[in-house]
Amino acid sequence: MQYTYLIIGGGIAGVTAAETIRAHDSHGSIAIVSDEAHMLYSRVLLPSYIKKRIPREKVFLRSIGDFEAKNIVVMSGERVMKIDSVRKEVFLASGRTIFFEKLCLFLNLLCYGLNLSLLLFIVLL
């Protein structure tokens, strides 16, 4: 698989980046890789859902249809194991390899062993 824009991180920052890129580039291919099983949900609303005060669908901030309508590929439940910024490759725990032209990282604070000096950060917009 190869994408013009590869976004690692499916939280609000990653999703907003994908939507913003799409608004400026209607033809480039965009993919979001997230280790979360479900895309963009509100952690704030989870207690209300658990207490059955709101329906499950209210917890999700975007549907898969929202991404499909914008031609954004979502890879949920996929953990990134390695990034090769020179060859522009990302290796997933599932064994898949993704090639990219531009890479955006939206990582949480639990990135153990990440050597930032080896990464190439690209400002997209």
Predicted segments, located by residue:
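FAD-binding core/adjacent interface of flavoenzyme oxidoreductases
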Residues: 1-6, 63-125
